[in-house]
Structures are given as C-alpha cells and as structure tokens.
C-alpha cells in the first residue's frame, strides 16, 4: 500500500522517512507550521531517494509554475479549488505527476449524496492520483462513510487525522489505494521515527 509521509522540513526527517515511506512532501505557498522556503525544498528534492511532492494551497497557475521551476519537482499535490483547466495546462506544459485533494466533511447527514457530489467534482479533473482529506492539513478525521463510497470508484489516497492508533481500522473500512500522514507521526512538531515505524507496521499489517 502506498504510504506518503508529508511535511518534511529537514534532511534528518527525510532520512527517517526514506526508511518507511514511498513518497514524502514539502509544504510551500500556504499557511502551515510545516511550510519551508523554496531553497530548502529544492535541496530536499535533490537529495531525496524517494519522490517528493510539492504541496500547496495556491490556485494560481503562475505560482505553481514557479514552484516547479524553482524546486525542480516532478510531483505536485494541490490542496485548493484550482480549476480543472489550470490543472490541465500545468500538466500539459510540465508533465508533472499531480495529486489533487478533494475535501470530505467531518460529519455528513447524507453521506451517499455527499459522495456523489464529490465524485462529480473528481470527474472534472484529469489527474494522476486522488487524495481525500478533511481539508488543508488540519489533522482532523473526516466522515469515512463518504470516502468508503468514493474508494469503490477510484484508487484514492486517504488523509485526515490518521495515526498509529486508528490507521489499521480505517484502512479496513475504506480500503484506499494509499494513505497520507503528517501530524499523526509527529512529536513536538517534528517527525518521530518511533511513530513512523509503528504507523508503517500498522499499515502493512492490514490484508485487503
């Protein structure tokens, strides 16, 4: 199962994540305690032995172009309402692997209806991977009844409040293609190898 451990800030964190993650990510152009500068991101991307997503909430095509050209990344993770034509233009010009986030509410009165509306939104985009999240790295769990429905139609990456205690049961319920974690493997705002190792083991223990 695809494991992405996001929000790295230092080469030391990267070294830890390379032992357990298939992908990682650097936070740029958004409000986040994990945000780093372009030069730091470029350095992490250059030295990494695993793919590094450049993660941002920007809706501006020019901002994404700057991220690509200044960091050298081939992987983008979009956490915004950027329109589908802009995504298409970026992909056509740069050929990047794009993972687009779609927001899932924390609680839903009508999960089937919410799922269908989100599916319609997803179908507007030509992207390489679909990420279902509670919203912009807030670390909150969303209504998995919705993501469970969507996961039956698409290979989704699941994010939002995942940690060592809940990831196994959530995977069994939703059956995602992969998982994306950040705050759930942190201690005092830094990536914790013990938590990352436990998270990895709990993910790999699930047989779908």
UniProtKB/Swiss-Prot annotation:
It comes from the Archaea. The gene is trpF. Transmembrane segments: none annotated. This is N-(5'-phosphoribosyl)anthranilate isomerase. It comes from Methanococcus vannielii (strain ATCC 35089 / DSM 1224 / JCM 13029 / OCM 148 / SB). Its EC number is 5.3.1.24. Pathway: Amino-acid biosynthesis; L-tryptophan biosynthesis; L-tryptophan from chorismate: step 3/5. HAMAP family: PRAI. It catalyses: N-(5-phospho-beta-D-ribosyl)anthranilate = 1-(2-carboxyphenylamino)-1-deoxy-D-ribulose 5-phosphate. GO terms for biological process: L-tryptophan biosynthetic process. The keyword Isomerase applies. Belongs to the TrpF family. It holds the Pfam family PRAI. Keywords: Amino-acid biosynthesis, Aromatic amino acid biosynthesis, Isomerase, Tryptophan biosynthesis. GO terms for molecular function: phosphoribosylanthranilate isomerase activity.
